[in-house]
């Protein structure tokens, strides 16, 4: 019987809100979920990148997206704020779907709590142009 998210996953979901706020976003997307998971050393080892590398890759993806519409900010791309807003940000529909899907991975593992690795598995299922899929591809 699945009991819900583990303490580690709860912490990752809170960090995802912080990651979204640091990037100036008003909703938590799948990319923010991935960045939050990269705070965990075990998940970072599975992905092959830590949160700093993930944030750098996300900034480069932002830069490329802006360049694609003719905006080249060069080195003037605003730096992330050093302090995130603490308000609870809503999840995008894709992020809600990934969190929900992580329960199926926990069920398949026959465990009672959803762990960060289960959310990572759900994010790895996402296809481009989903933000987590694009970020995972950029991380190699």
Task: Locate predicted features.
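Histone-fold recognition with a strong bias for associated Lys/Arg-rich disordered tails
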Residues: 1-140
């Amino acid at each position: 019987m699945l009991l819900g998210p583990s303490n580690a996953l709860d912490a990752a979901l809170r960090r995802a809100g912080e990651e979204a706020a640091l990037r100036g976003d008003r909703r938590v997307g799948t990319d923010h979920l991935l960045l939050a998971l990269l705070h965990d050393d075990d998940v970072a080892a599975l992905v092959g990148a830590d949160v700093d590398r993930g944030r750098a890759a996300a900034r480069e993806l932002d830069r490329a997206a802006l360049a694609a519409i003719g905006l080249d900010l060069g080195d003037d791309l605003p730096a992330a704020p050093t302090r995130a807003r603490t308000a609870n940000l809503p999840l995008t529909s894709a992020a809600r779907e990934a969190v929900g899907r992580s329960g199926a991975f926990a069920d398949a593992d026959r465990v009672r709590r959803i762990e960060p690795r289960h959310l990572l598995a759900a994010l790895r299922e996402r296809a481009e142009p989903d933000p987590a899929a694009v970020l995972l591809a950029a991380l190699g």
